[in-house]
Every structure is written in C-alpha cells, then in structure tokens.
Design a protein with these regions (language model features):
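Penicillin-recognizing serine hydrolase domain
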Residues: 1-140
Length: 140
C-alpha cells in the first residue's frame, strides 16, 4: 500500500497496523479523489472501464448482507461508487460513499463519515444519502 500511495501521491493514506484488517486503512477524502482522478485520467481505457463498470454494477446488498444503496448509490442518475462501512471503533459507525456521481464522468465525490453508534446504520445511511443528494444537485 505504501508503494502505491507514494506512486499516486496519496500523502494521507496509510496501511492498517494489522494487515489483515484492511478496513482500518487510514485515508482522506482528498486521497480518495486523487485515486479516482488516476482511474479516470491516468489508466489505460480498458482498465478504467473495468473498474468503473464494476463500481457501477454494485448490487444493493453486498456479499456480507449489508445494504449499500445509500449515498451516491441511492440517487439518480446511477453512480459508479465504492461504499464502505465498519462498526464500531471508538463508539462510531464508519460509513463512506465515494465515486463518480454523473454519467458524463465530470465529477468525483468522496463522502467519508464517522457517526455516533447511537444513530444506527439506517440513520447513518440517511445522513450520507442526504449529503450525497445535496452535493449532487448543483453538479447536474
């Protein structure tokens, strides 16, 4: 991870202390946007289309049973987005939605949230979706 982060200029991305806990990778919204920028403008077309196609085809329910139709994936038009979730470090729910919100691929949005465990996953999803809707509206 350190090699790729250095190559792509992602100064705030760090591997987790325990490599088996990939969900504890530290990153910033800025680094997420820089990574998407690399995918959109720095990769061969075939590789870019493979990644964006997979993101755009994300199912509403993830393999682990978690509902991921929130944030950028909850709105219209359909987005190409990577969702992230984890509970409950320091009493917080971590819920992220980052990707390309428009079919023209003109914009990249990174929504990274850490919310009190008490709001529950439904409340956390609603918050991230509300923010995604607010961000997406002026981009249309």
């Amino acid at each position: 991870m350190a090699r790729v982060a250095a190559r792509l200029g992602l100064p705030e991305t760090r591997a987790p202390r325990d490599p088996s806990q990939w969900g504890e990778t530290v990153l910033s919204a800025r680094d997420v946007v820089l990574l998407y920028d690399h995918v959109l403008s720095g990769m061969p077309t075939e590789d870019r289309e493979l990644i964006i196609g997979a993101l755009a085809a994300a199912p509403p329910i993830a393999t682990d049973g978690f509902g991921q139709a929130f944030g950028l994936l909850a709105g219209a038009p359909p987005a190409a987005s990577k969702q992230g979730w984890m509970c409950c470090q320091a009493g917080q729910i971590t819920l992220h939605s980052a990707g390309i919100p428009d079919p023209g691929r003109r914009f990249v949005v990174a929504l990274l949230s850490s919310q009190p465990r008490g709001v529950g996953y439904d409340g956390a999803r609603d918050t991230v979706t509300d923010v995604a809707d607010a961000v997406r509206a002026p981009l249309a």
